[in-house]
Curated annotation (Swiss-Prot):
InterPro entries: P-loop_NTPase, Stf3_sulfotransferase. This is Omega-hydroxy-beta-dihydromenaquinone-9 sulfotransferase Stf3. Its EC number is 2.8.2.40. It comes from Mycobacterium tuberculosis (strain ATCC 25618 / H37Rv). Belongs to the Stf3 family. Pfam families: Sulfotransfer_3 (PF13469).
Length: 388
């Protein structure tokens, strides 16, 4: 009984102190509140108080890191161009990211590094002491979550007061935030240079820390391949696609979970379904444009269902195509990861007739292009590797 009460208190604390905005520096936090006219719901008042204090701490630590590490990071040469995992939300980008960083020649930015980009070089040793704030599983599915798991780098811009579409999560009932920063095409030259410098500096920091090939996973980068190539001309790209009939309800569920947990308002979800439909179409339009700019030897594509069905075979082909080194050196770690996660089950969704018609009408081209059966559901388990 005592353990149950303790667990309940811990769950309430995690809800009370949801960690997404905990890494904002003072200017980031103030800009977010002012831009949205301090429209914080009364049930979220504690966020405004807690994060105002923490944001000042983050700003001080950021200045300290710049003094201690700024010069050394700036002088760091990124010897290995980064690898970008692109694709729509809920298509398996996180799974692929985790599979690839199992290889000890690769690394990905951790949750702590993405939420504290301005001072993680100084304070990452402290991350285990605040791990209790984080749920052990993601809000939208059953995948493991912690501050040391790889995370999306989009939060790097949010935490430093720079524009990002992800700021919509904080105020979901307000107009969408910074949509022009999805593809960056309408961003003024000065702001675009700031965006590029932020990306380059963050990759420098991660590379400085571990001296390994940095793998970044960020669905919004699917819109930005042209700009990514301007920053890293030799970058490699991996695109993963998944059954659109699964992606549609799963993406809606993702947004609802993020808005409920990390929003500073009580979300109404007005227009959410339509937004998911249109964003998907726009993403694949920009992804198709971007891939034309990449040398085919540096762009690889796979289906989530094929990865789940034969992870070892799919990753072996990926390694060969992109020239990622000796696959056999990676194989023991890969097999261990697969064995450890063999019981993982994905969420299942039942589409209404109306929802299926929406997917058919708007996403039919992607369904046909990637050979998806309009009636057959995907497998739900990650199959462990067998034999050689």
């Amino acid at each position: 009984m005592k353990a149950l009460r303790s667990s309940s208190r811990l769950s309430r604390w995690r809800e009370w102190a949801a960690p997404l905005w905990v890494g904002c520096n003072f200017s980031a936090w103030m800009r977010l509140l002012i831009r949205n006219r301090f429209a914080v719901h009364h049930s979220r008042w504690h966020f405004a108080v807690l994060y105002t204090f923490l944001s000042m701490v983050n700003s001080c630590l950021g200045l300290w890191q710049k003094i201690v590490f700024g010069r050394r990071v700036a002088e760091t040469v990124i010897a290995d161009p980064p690898i970008f995992i692109v694709g729509h939300w809920r298509t398996g980008t996180t799974l692929l990211h985790e599979l690839l960083v199992v290889d000890d020649r690769h690394t990905g930015p951790t949750g702590y590094e993405c939420l504290a980009p301005h001072h993680f070089l100084l304070t990452e040793w402290f991350a285990p002491y605040v791990e209790f704030l984080v749920s052990k599983h993601r809000a939208m599915d059953n995948m493991d979550l912690s501050l040391h798991h790889p995370q999306e780098d989009e939060f790097v811009w949010c935490m430093q007061g720079l524009p990002s579409p992800y700021l919509t999560i904080a105020f979901p009932n307000r107009p969408p935030q910074y949509e022009e920063y999805l593809d960056l095409e309408q961003v003024a030259p000065r702001e675009l240079e700031i965006w590029k410098r932020t990306l380059f500096r963050f990759v420098q920091q991660v590379y400085f820390r571990r001296r390994k090939t940095v793998i970044l996973k960020n669905p919004t980068h699917s819109f930005r391949i042209k700009v990514l190539l301007e920053v890293f001309p030799q970058a490699k790209f991996i695109h993963i696609v998944r059954d659109p009939y699964v992606v549609y309800p799963s993406t809606i569920h993702l947004h609802k979970a993020l808005y409920r947990i990390h929003g500073l308002q009580q979300p109404t979800f007005d227009g959410l379904d339509d937004k998911v439909v249109s964003t998907y179409v726009d993403l694949y339009r920009k992804l198709d444009e971007g891939r034309e700019l990449v040398d085919p030897t540096r762009f690889y594509e796979l289906r989530y269902e094929d990865l789940i069905g034969d992870p070892e075979g799919q990753l072996r082909r990926l390694y060969q195509h992109l020239g990622l080194g000796d696959f056999e050196c990676y194989l023991p770690r890969l097999r261990q990861y697969l064995a450890d996660h063999a019981d993982y089950k994905t969420n299942s969704y039942q589409l209404t007739v109306e929802q299926r018609a929406i997917v058919d009408e708007h996403w039919g081209e992607i369904i046909d292009r990637y050979g998806y059966d309009r009636h057959t559901p995907e497998p739900a388990r990650l199959r462990p590797a067998v034999g050689g």
